[in-house]
Amino acid sequence: MKRLVLISLVLAAGCSTVPPTNVHQPMTARPSPRFEMANGNGSIYQAASSRPLFEDRRARFVGDTITVKITESTTASTKSNNKVDQSNAQKYGLGASTGMFGRVLPGAMDMSASSSTAFSGKGEAANNNIFTGNMTVTVIDVMPNGNLLVSGEKQVAIGSEQEFVRISGVVNPSFVDAFNVVDSSKIADARIEYKSSGQVSDGQVMGWLARFFLNVMPF
């Protein structure tokens, strides 16, 4: 009985999988190494833990957070029209034939051939995507030139459905406004994902047996 329950739990866990991701890892800041506390010097100012008094609170260190304003809109279209029409006609002859073969089949030495090819094809495709929203990400690395590598994930569970929003990329601190917000169009190497996991998303995917027959069918 225990073995049956264990197998059932393993199968249930396999049915609820997290969609794979291509964003920069890790999804949050790495744990910082622990340093020994510096000895106090008896003064209010401590050089080991000081930050400028009039410094703004924009993200610039590992572990800081930045709010990303997602305003993605892409439109693409393509159209093609191909037409091919080709014809060919040939005729060969040796004139009057002599001998018995020529008397029996007087036109046997005259040959003609013709061919005609016609092809017409049209294709048109259009794609329009809009993705808007806000999400806060974490600085996971600071590059030598000061740019920030950010990454973050948001999970929302509604009933049996789970939605995953993931963002990562490189942010120039000069593009971050006074409210610590940056537009997604200002993120370099941006990787923005919106995926879901659950019964609804599974119903939109063709089953493995149907995919197998679709691949082996010659027509």
Swiss-Prot record:
One of its GO terms (biological process) is bacterial-type flagellum-dependent cell motility. A lipid is attached at C15 (N-palmitoyl cysteine). It is found in: Cell outer membrane; Bacterial flagellum basal body. GO terms for molecular function: cytoskeletal motor activity. Pfam families: FlgH. InterPro entries: Flag_Lring. It comes from the Bacteria. Residues 1-14 form the signal peptide. The keyword Zinc-finger does not apply. One of its GO terms (cellular component) is cell outer membrane. Its main location: membrane. A lipid is attached at C15 (S-diacylglycerol cysteine). HAMAP family: FlgH (MF_00415). PANTHER family: FLAGELLAR L-RING PROTEIN. The basal body constitutes a major portion of the flagellar organelle and consists of four rings (L,P,S, and M) mounted on a central rod. Belongs to the FlgH family. This is Flagellar L-ring protein. It comes from Dechloromonas aromatica (strain RCB). The gene is flgH.
